[in-house]
Amino acid sequence: MPSKEIDINQKKNVLPKPEDIQLIICDVDGTLLGPDHKPHPRNLRALKYLRENYPQLPFVLATGRQRTSVGNIREALGLHVFPCVHLNGCVVYDKGEIVACAALKNSLAIDIIDKLKDIQTCALFGYDEDYVYQIKQESDKKQHGIKFLRLCGETVKDDANEMLPQLKGPKDIFNKMVVFDDDTNGLEEAKKRLAGIPSDEVALTQALPQTFEIIPPNDNKGVALKNILSKIYPSISLENVLAFGDGANDVCMFELAGYSVAIRSGMPVALKAAKAISDVSSAEGAVGEVLERIYNIPPDFN
């Protein structure tokens, strides 16, 4: 039997008791949402149960997306009253107001653009707090990257011409940058070219096989979690946090939270790092399945 299956079977029942959880932080794509980029009915049902029966329990979304792209999810689940983590920890909001924000240095963004500009198959994007800007498109001009990001709900502008001159100004422009390539060889070449940038200037993180993100070195979902506890919920300790995720970019949350659950369909690095693993995939409502077991949600609740 493969070791991954052994890990899943060993970990699927390692779950906390309801009284041990004071905050839940949850990744979005591949975790709360299924492959169709929509929340599974099982997840919606479980979140409804929590909001009705544990209305003071914070449920924090933590995603690489911008805040605008998950507004429909936040409102549908009644999560607008809680903090949220966006751009993989670069921006933290509380009730719509920014409480923590980080950006890549303009000089670094210029260097990254220069290093990646001639990789034919790659698309490159820059993110600020409101929009995604396409800096470079794939050579075949089929715009797979833009189509993918728009499918995920991002507001993408076809080119970054209006933003690039601002990289020469005093205000750092991009909170993060994203490399997209359907060809994994292109992604590996991009990573190789960026490897020479000192680790105290930039960090690379990955949630999906066809893309990776370039973020400030001291900002990720784990750092954002600590910011939320210190600035918004100082009475809650990390040991009473439950984290859900499926990607390499969620491991930093798993390393801090007292309880962590990887989605069964997630990346091997996430499955290895989490204390528990869901019994079903994101396509089957993994978050809801785990919450049903923790909170003993009645089968007839709707």
Curated annotation (Swiss-Prot):
Domain of life: Eukaryota
EC number annotated for this UniProt entry: 3.-.-.-
Statement: the UniProt record of this protein carries the keyword Hydrolase: yes
Recorded GO CC terms: cytosol; nucleus
Residues in the signal sequence: none
The keyword Cell wall biogenesis/degradation is assigned to this record: no
Record keywords: Cytoplasm, Hydrolase, Nucleus
Name of the top EC class for this enzyme: hydrolase
Example GO molecular function: magnesium ion binding
Pfam families: Hydrolase_3
Location in the cell: Cytoplasm; Nucleus
InterPro entries per UniProt: Cof, HAD-like_sf, HAD-SF_hydro_IIB, HAD_sf
PANTHER family per UniProt: HAD SUPERFAMILY HYDROLASE-LIKE, TYPE 3, PHOSPHOSERINE PHOSPHATASE
Family: Belongs to the HAD-like hydrolase superfamily.
The protein's name in its UniProt record: Uncharacterized hydrolase C215.10
Organism per entry: Schizosaccharomyces pombe (strain 972 / ATCC 24843)
